Amino acid sequence: MKKNIIIAMMAILALLLCACGAKQEGFGQDDLGLEVNGETYYLRTDSAPLIAALGDGYEYSEMVSCVYDGQDKTFAYPGLTVNTVPVDGKDIIEMFTLTDSTYATLRGCKVGDSREAVIAAYGEEYFDDGYINYTLTNDPADIQAERIQFEMNGDTVSAIYIYSPSY
């Protein structure tokens, strides 16, 4: 009887541990952001709070927007470039480009990580067109789908693009 109780308790404990180790969900809207100083900034939101958090140490450029009325802007920081588009009087985040290991994706991937680390973090549902692509639709033909692209140099991440195409 005592042995059966111990076995039953071990089975319950095993079930509880399995329930706590919830599987990472597939790629989704919540992955389309960047954490800076404990705050998360997402694509398609006002860039002003992010630029304020990053500070003044950037190289700035702008050009007439092909899609919107106003100026597309680029704020290039060491290891991170933020591209914006003008929407309703605000500079909206269109893309983050991570170029060194200073910044990570919201799942912790950085420049310098291995291909295996990326797949472990984001899963097998990607397509490879020269980049490892995780998109909201997982459709290579859907060029308008928001995405994360991992540029590879061999099996090592050399740049990461988190973006929302405007076209």
For each feature predicted by the language model, list its residue ranges.
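A cross-family detector of function-defining hotspots
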Residues: 47-89, 110, 115-167
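Second-shell loop/turn segments in exported
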Residues: 34-41, 102-109, 147
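Acidic/histidine-rich, surface-exposed loop or edge segments in extracytoplasmic proteins
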Residues: 28-36, 94-103
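Positively charged n-region of N-terminal signal peptides that target proteins for export
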Residues: 1-4
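N-terminal export/targeting and maturation segments
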Residues: 25-59
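C-terminal motif of bacterial Sec signal peptides marking the signal peptidase cleavage site
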Residues: 16-19
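Bacterial signal peptide processing site
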Residues: 21-23
